[in-house]
């Protein structure tokens, strides 16, 4: 349990250091046990398009510090899962790997 608490604190510190407190992720304990982080897409990991949503890779722009945070999370052994409720994802208009 002590090791788990240390890992949870490391995630919290990383988010604070990178200024990414707005990341949408599950309860820290559940996240640590399952080693997955769920991230919302538009406005959390990438720049939101006003009045629209990102449909093409050319429109996709990571927000500051996100790349570094994702790399650190991967190093810590997390599975990164990007979620979205954007209409295009249901219509299979959005296809790309980050």
Swiss-Prot record:
GO biological process, one term: carbohydrate metabolic process
Alphabetical list of SUPFAM superfamilies matching this protein: HAD-like
Upper classification of the organism: Archaea, Methanobacteriati, Methanobacteriota, Methanomada group, Methanococci
Organism name: Methanocaldococcus jannaschii (strain ATCC 43067 / DSM 2661 / JAL-1 / JCM 10045 / NBRC 100440) (Methanococcus jannaschii)
Official protein name in the record: Uncharacterized protein MJ0015
Gene Ontology MF: a single term: phosphatase activity
Gene3D superfamilies: HAD superfamily/HAD-like
Organism domain of life: Archaea
Disulfide bonds: none
């Amino acid at each position: 349990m002590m090791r788990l608490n240390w890992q949870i604190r490391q995630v919290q510190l990383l988010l604070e250091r990178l200024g990414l407190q707005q990341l949408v992720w599950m309860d820290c304990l559940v996240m640590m046990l399952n080693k997955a982080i769920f991230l919302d897409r538009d406005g959390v990991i990438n720049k939101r398009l006003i009045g629209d949503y990102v449909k093409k890779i050319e429109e996709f722009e990571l927000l500051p510090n996100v790349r570094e945070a994702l790399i650190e999370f991967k190093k810590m052994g997390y599975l990164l899962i990007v979620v979205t409720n954007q209409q295009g994802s249901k219509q299979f208009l959005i296809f790309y790997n980050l």
